[in-house]
Amino acid sequence: MLQEMHKKFESLFDVKADVRAFAPGRINLIGEHTDYNGGYVFPAAIELGTYGLASKRTDRIIQLYSNNFEDTGIVSFTLDELEFNEQHDWANYPKGVVKYLKEEFNDINQGFNILVEGNIPNGASLSSSASIELLTGWLIKQLFNLHLERLQLIKLGQVVENKFMGVNSGIMDQFIIGMGKAEHAILLDTATLDFDYVPAKFGDYVISIMNTNKRRSLTESKYNERRSECENALSQLQQQLEITSLGELSLAQFEKYQSLITDEVVCRRAKHAISENERTKLAHKALADNNFEQFGQLLNASHKSLKEDYEVTGIELDTLAETAQQVEGVLGARMTGAGFAGCAIALVDKNSIQKLEDEVSKAYIDKIGYAPSFYHVGISDGVKAL
């Protein structure tokens, strides 16, 4: 892929690339919709991701091109035109990174050319947007020799999502893409950003990624609505509790005080955030103890909560996860990512992978009318120069 990208770069921009980098995508093993509630998450970076090449220019023009969106052509603007532009589509993500990096580093005083190509399926909820954000930051870091720490770039990526793109997401995606480590997941406390690397070894089992192949736009989904509902629950609980996030409560504490929340729907949203936080801590222990059966049961319980209490699954994700849960050799399955579409994951015996794919595909085609896709990918390092 890189050899072809170098040729494409020269034909597009008439110069050779100076630097190149890779940023992975991610799966979240468990801990869904907990990152903006001050809870724990348990993600891993994956070998699917985004590759990028870049070269400096002598003027102030920035030119961006994606092999994944060839119809868009070269997106061009200057260092003085760093505002969101709907017509610039995917290029708003790198543009946002440039905007906030430029505010922190005076060294960014020249334009540059960037070519990107990703192999994360579009709309799969495997964090292609955070991948391109951190990739852009790492390319610019190399081009201008910036003293840019990983955590600094991670936080900047979240600012791009929140302020530039208008999605009130938490920090999980950027964190795992910035800090990922091959063959390890990260248990991250999103309240403090304390984290542990945890070997992601499942013995005779593997994680299978199952894609609904239904497109979802995060900004237009109910993501922001769910966050607002959780903030509503928190403010009602704060009438009697000195807490700053739902992640500070145990399930037992929540059950004691849940009557403070007047709206039944809002109460269920909070119940998910708090119960999912407990499941994530239990899953960490289960994996450390090689208790894969319990890990699988926690995946199933997570999906049930996301379906019934948080209501972010939908018929496509439910069909994938619930069919997979019934397949012999599968210990557990759940949706991963923001929900509404995208992917589910299953913990499946290596000898049952084909059985899983056959049975889930048949059920999915029967109910939804088109086929899902399946991926088996290794766990990767975080963003890096190549």
UniProtKB/Swiss-Prot annotation:
GO terms for biological process: galactose metabolic process. Pfam families: GalKase_gal_bdg, GHMP_kinases_C, GHMP_kinases_N. It comes from the Bacteria. It catalyses: alpha-D-galactose + ATP = alpha-D-galactose 1-phosphate + ADP + H(+). GO terms for cellular component: cytosol. Mg(2+) binds at residues 129, 161. Keywords: ATP-binding, Carbohydrate metabolism, Cytoplasm, Galactose metabolism, Kinase, Magnesium, Metal-binding, Nucleotide-binding, Transferase. The record marks 26 as: Transition state stabilizer. The keyword Magnesium applies. It is found in: Cytoplasm. It is an enzyme of class 2 (transferase). Substrate binds at residues 32-35, 223. ATP binds at residues 66, 123-129. Pathway: Carbohydrate metabolism; galactose metabolism. Its EC number is 2.7.1.6. The keyword Magnesium applies. The active site is at residue 173. Belongs to the GHMP kinase family. GalK subfamily. Catalyzes the transfer of the gamma-phosphate of ATP to D-galactose to form alpha-D-galactose-1-phosphate (Gal-1-P). This is Galactokinase. It comes from Staphylococcus saprophyticus subsp. saprophyticus (strain ATCC 15305 / DSM 20229 / NCIMB 8711 / NCTC 7292 / S-41). The gene is galK.
